[in-house]
Design a protein with these regions (language model features):
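Bacterial N-terminal signal peptides that target proteins for export
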Residues: 1-8
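Short acidic/histidine-centered micro-motifs embedded in hydrophobic/aromatic stretches
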Residues: 3, 291, 334
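Bacterial N-terminal signal peptides
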Residues: 8-17
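Compositionally biased alpha-helical segments
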Residues: 21-181, 188-241, 247, 251-282, ...
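Terminal, low-structured helical/coil segments at or just beyond the last alpha-helical repeat
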Residues: 242-243, 247-250, 260, 298-345
Length: 345
């Protein structure tokens, strides 16, 4: 009876280890001074050790000091290849599900900070999951993996986008002031641009710092536009709450001027976001179009400016043609061709 109990305990232990560990990944470890190759199945790794089983199901893994390992050659799992294929085909909705599964499957290696574990697929899965969420507009769902992506072992080439994930987290939380301040860190200071004070360069054309790639620039322009747009809306509420009188005229004019500059800047940035990367980030381009249409209708000159009305009509037709599902019903009036007030004169 005693031996039977021990056997059952041992069997349960093996089963529990197999179930609780991450999905094993086939790999070959090069170990020792003689650089011998040891094939096996990696189940997990921490900052100091890597755990390898001789069995495909990952049972009974043995720990090896990463300090004794000179190289690790990974074999890409089929489910990982399928997830990357979805990414490469721009199928981000399906990709988000695939990378979420990969996050769970390979979580056992994601957090290891050892240099040999840098850019492992467990860490990459968190990154690609966040990117799929971003590209499909699931911004609030990015909050939990955003905490996680900061902990995984990804190299320098991933860090610029990881930093931008913070901006999307601000957007998800409607934190417009922190988002706007964050976007200011990417732009050249106004005092460093000759001509801003003399109207050679308009205040809504503040350029970004050198060295930012176009993929990130598109996101920065959109996030800067969105935060500026929303902050202008907050100022507009303040303006509407001020009593109209001679005593408040100066205050109202000052606020109105600030709102005008901010909305002009936001509109410029929306246009940049949708065009700078040739629309390669389709979701971002569509959102930029939609939000710019909302903004155009708020511009004081829109009601009498036929040129602006024609531009809004053309963009509305384009957006509705590209993705009718994203086109808001409250903008349906823009689908009607505007009438030139000077026609026939």
């Amino acid at each position: 009876m005693k031996f039977e109990n021990l056997f059952i305990i041992a069997l349960l232990s093996i089963l529990f280890t197999s179930i609780s560990s991450a999905k094993p990944i086939a790999a070959t470890l090069t170990i020792g001074k003689n650089k011998q190759d040891f094939p096996g199945y990696v189940t997990k790794a921490d900052d100091n050790n890597i755990y390898v089983s001789q069995f495909e199901n990952g049972v009974s893994p043995a720990g090896y000091a990463l300090s004794s390992v000179s190289d690790i050659s990974w074999r890409e799992p089929d489910d990982w290849k399928e997830a990357i294929d979805l990414w490469n085909r721009n199928e981000y909705k399906k990709g988000s599900a695939a990378f979420l599964e990969a996050m769970d499957n390979y979580k056992g290696i994601a957090d290891s900070k050892h240099p040999l574990m840098k850019d492992n697929i467990g860490a990459q899965a968190v990154f690609y999951y966040m990117e799929c969420l971003r590209r499909t507009g699931q911004f609030k769902a990015m909050m939990e993996p955003y905490v996680r992506v900061q902990k995984v072992n990804l190299g320098s080439k991933w860090q610029d986008q990881i930093r931008l994930f913070q901006g999307w987290a601000h957007l998800a939380g409607n934190k417009w002031s922190p988002l706007n301040l964050m976007m200011e860190t990417y732009q050249i200071n106004e005092k460093d641009i000759p001509g801003v004070g003399t109207y050679t360069v308009a205040p809504n054309e503040l350029p970004l710092k050198n060295g930012i790639n176009v993929h990130h620039m598109a996101q920065i322009f959109f996030l800067r536009a969105k935060s500026t747009d929303e902050l202008a809306n907050e100022l507009d509420k303040e303006l509407q709450a001020i009593e109209i009188s001679d005593e408040t005229m100066e205050e109202r004019n000052e606020l109105s001027s600030r709102i005008g500059v901010m909305r002009s800047k936001a509109l410029t940035d929306y246009n940049r976001a949708m065009t700078i990367n040739y629309g390669q980030d389709r979701g971002l381009s569509l959102r930029s179009m939609r939000d710019s249409l909302y903004l155009i209708k708020k511009m004081p000159s829109y009601a009498e400016n036929f040129t602006m009305q024609k531009e809004a009509h053309g963009m509305a037709k384009l957006l509705n043609g590209l993705n009718p599902g994203i086109f808001p019903s409250e903008l349906n009036d823009l689908l009607q061709e505007p009438v030139d007030p000077n026609a026939g004169k």
